[in-house]
């Protein structure tokens, strides 16, 4: 009986510790390839933030997963404020070249402003 109780408590503690360590992010994105009717995987997306002089500074760069998603832009941490003007650049031309297709858009820029700490999702 003591072993079962100890095992149960150990599992509960471990579960709480692991869930407390799970990071959260303020920004995510998703790309659907409407020509194929499926997610666009392995597409590079760069995240820029505009400074007070109007210049764009790259702050992150990732590739979409097999579901066409990036879930982890702008990690939420205590005392971190992500307010500001941002730009996501979706590098679509290499994706279409890999599929032997022409692309009208070599890249797609999406500009947006974060004014609070809510989660935002930018799909294209």
Label every PLM stretch briefly.
Residues 83-124:
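Feature of secretome-associated and extracellular-like proteins
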Residues 7-40, 49, 56:
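Beta-strand-rich domain onsets/edges
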Residues 53-73:
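Short, acidic Ser/Thr/Gly-rich low-complexity loop/linker segments typical of extracellular
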Residues 1-4:
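Positively charged n-region of N-terminal signal peptides that target proteins for export
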Residues 71-84:
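Short Pro-Gly-centered beta-turn/loop motif in secreted/extracellular proteins
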Residues 44-48, 87-89:
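Beta-strand signatures of extracellular beta-sandwich domains
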Residues 59-63, 76-78, 98-99, 109-112:
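Beta-strand-rich interaction surfaces with strong enrichment in secreted/lumenal proteins
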């Amino acid at each position: 009986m003591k072993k079962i109780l100890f095992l149960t408590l150990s599992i509960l503690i471990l579960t709480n510790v692991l869930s407390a360590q799970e990071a959260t992010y303020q920004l995510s994105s998703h790309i659907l390839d409407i020509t194929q009717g499926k997610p666009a995987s392995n597409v590079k997306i760069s995240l820029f933030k505009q400074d007070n002089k109007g210049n764009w500074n790259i702050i992150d760069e990732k590739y979409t997963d097999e579901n066409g998603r990036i879930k982890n832009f702008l990690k939420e941490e205590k005392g971190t404020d992500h307010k500001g003007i941002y730009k996501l650049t979706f590098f679509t031309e290499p994706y279409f070249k890999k599929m032997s297709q022409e692309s009208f858009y070599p890249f797609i820029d999406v500009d947006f402003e974060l004014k609070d700490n809510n989660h935002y999702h930018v799909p294209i």
